[in-house]
Amino acid sequence: MKRSVMASLFLGACLFSAGAYSASADDKAVDFIRRADEVRSPNKPFRYTLTIHEFKTGATQPDNKQVLDISMRFMKPEGEMKADARSLARFIYPPRDKGKVLLSDWYDLWFYTPELRRPVPVSRQQRLIGQISNGDVIVTNFEYAYDATLKGEEPCGETQCYKLELVRKSAEVTWPKVDYYVEKEGDNRPYKAAYFSLDNKLIKEVLYQDFQMVLGKMRPMKIVVKEARHGKSYSVMTYSDVRYESLPESAFTRESIQRGAK
């Protein structure tokens, strides 16, 4: 009887210890993605130019090009400031695309062109150019969109990374699962993200590169996107002219883009 009680106490202690470790690891995972989110996007409204180049297999020069002028209201609650996740992507190049606009309001995405009477809903997975989908040009808040689990450490080039498994919190989130690699040291800068389908097939990989001091923090100014099913073809997103901006909330509405986004 005494041995049985001791065994039960030992088993209970082990389960408690494992549970405490799991909770601690999950808390760390949330902290890591929060810090990486802060690297990818400041917690203030900002604006930037996004240039996308598509490279075919074996090509040294881009086959296609798209330029967007993007305004972001992507903020987490802080003091009296409420959470927000809206963006406005204006098409600049090629010239035939001028006047087209993508409006993102949390998980809703709308497309407008002067030929249409009103904005129409579109999918974030819909292809925009090359390996880039509509959702790729808009910053994703991983902390809000995914539950995170710390899976361990792996080498990332010349540094060491934490590997995080992200599982979406709702069906509204575009990708069901993401393997997310963030640097172990410093600000937990994002290194790579691998996106998976519902049946756990790799769809694409995203590499964060060319970190520069922008808006008070080292941020990736280049993102390389590779799709698993397109061989060695890839697309490159380059960020420039990044600055703070204070567009009114009213600018991020379907009515506003019909009148002409500024």
Q: Language-model segments: which ranges?
A:
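Functional cores of ribonucleases/endoribonucleases
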Residues: 70-103
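Flexible, processing/modification-adjacent segments and terminal tails
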Residues: 23-45, 52, 60-64, 95-176, ...
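Edge/loop elements at the starts and ends of beta-strands within beta-rich repeat scaffolds
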Residues: 37-46, 80-82, 213-217
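Bacterial N-terminal signal peptides that target proteins for export
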Residues: 1-9
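N-terminal, post-signal-peptide region of Sec/Tat-exported proteins
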Residues: 48-82
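Bacterial N-terminal signal peptides
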Residues: 8-17
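Gly/Pro-enriched, hydrophobic low-complexity segments
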Residues: 108, 118-122, 137, 159-254
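Extended lipid/amphipathic-ligand handling interfaces
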Residues: 36-37, 69-78, 208-213
